[in-house]
Amino acid sequence: MNSERRGVLLDTSVLINLLHRRKEPVALIRELSLRGFVLATSAVNVAEIYAGLRIGEEQETRDLLSTLKCLPVTPKIARKAGDITAARRRIGRTHWLDDMMVAATAIEHGYTLLTDNRKDFEIPEIELFSA
């Protein structure tokens, strides 16, 4: 991971793994935090997490999300996401708009995107890292 980038945006796949206490992402997040990285997520990821919330996970989910900086989707980010989606469609590659909003958020803030779904974010402008 590029040491000049001091922020890491956690994608929904990583948040789910943290909620399920999978060892690899928990250890990685702990290390990133100790190394001084800002740990963040997007408002889009928050919506995705709450949409798939299981009964009994409410408090644990709130606790996890409260430890992260939540980056909003601004009009500039929304436009960037639309531009990326349209450009990818023109070359025959389709991506979900919600994923492109997450990608645009990471790009706009200069954050590395931590995801377990690299194929969803195959765009040249973004730095990806996997747990």
Label for each model-derived stretch:
Residues 11-12, 49, 81, 106, ...:
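Generic structural signal for small/hydrophobic residues in well-ordered secondary structure
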Residues 55, 116-119:
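Short, polar loop motifs at secondary-structure junctions
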Residues 15-16, 47-50, 122, 129:
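Nucleotide phosphate-binding site architecture
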Residues 2-6, 69-116:
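Active-site neighborhoods of divalent-metal-dependent phosphate/nucleic-acid chemistry enzymes
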Residues 1-41, 50-66:
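Short, well-structured N-terminal submotif of metal-dependent ribonuclease cores
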Residues 68-69, 125-130:
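Active-site regions of enzymes building and remodeling cell-envelope glycoconjugates
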Residues 14-15, 45, 77, 101-102, ...:
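Alpha-helix capping/helix-boundary segments
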